[in-house]
Amino acid sequence: MSNKKIIKIIKLQIPGGKANPAPPIGPALGAAGVNIMGFCKEFNAATQDRPGDLLPVVITVYSDKTFSFVMKQSPVSSLIKKALGLESGSKIPNRNKVGKLTRAQITVIAEQKMKDMDVVLLESAERMVEGTARSMGVDVE
């Protein structure tokens, strides 16, 4: 791949196993000249074990219209909602609290996300998770 020139990098968030040519995937990939169905099939095959999880994906498009993609961990807010069984965060986070995260849950989420975060210490990742939780109206132990 060293002789291929990168022409575009596309960042999307797609539910696992549910990629289809409809917006936002189709227009983003179509504008770059990528085979949309080829991407959808590859992505769905790679994410069949994580159905419904919102997954950030970075798609690299090369000059010969081929592509490669890298999946990242779900966003922290999605992991918090999943851990607490929430549909969404609070509309007024400083007044209305929608749940409470335990220290153990924070540690698990931080460990999952650490490879995507620019942190070295687990404690730093935990503080980032706590900040996201507070901004969603979730109490932190």
Curated annotation (Swiss-Prot):
Keywords on record: Methylation, Ribonucleoprotein, Ribosomal protein, RNA-binding, rRNA-binding
Any single GO BP term: translation
GO CC, any one term: cytosolic large ribosomal subunit
Function: Forms part of the ribosomal stalk which helps the ribosome interact with GTP-bound translation factors.
SMART domains attached to this UniProt entry: RL11 (SM00649)
Tagged with keyword Ribonucleoprotein: yes
Pfam families: Ribosomal_L11 (PF00298), Ribosomal_L11_N (PF03946)
Similarity remark: Belongs to the universal ribosomal protein uL11 family.
Organism of provenance: Chlamydia trachomatis serovar D (strain ATCC VR-885 / DSM 19411 / UW-3/Cx)
Post-translational modification remark: One or more lysine residues are methylated.
Taxon lineage: Bacteria, Pseudomonadati, Chlamydiota, Chlamydiia, Chlamydiales
GO molecular function: large ribosomal subunit rRNA binding; structural constituent of ribosome
Protein name per Swiss-Prot or TrEMBL: Large ribosomal subunit protein uL11
UniProt subunit comment: Part of the ribosomal stalk of the 50S ribosomal subunit. Interacts with L10 and the large rRNA to form the base of the stalk. L10 forms an elongated spine to which L12 dimers bind in a sequential fashion forming a multimeric L10(L12)X complex.
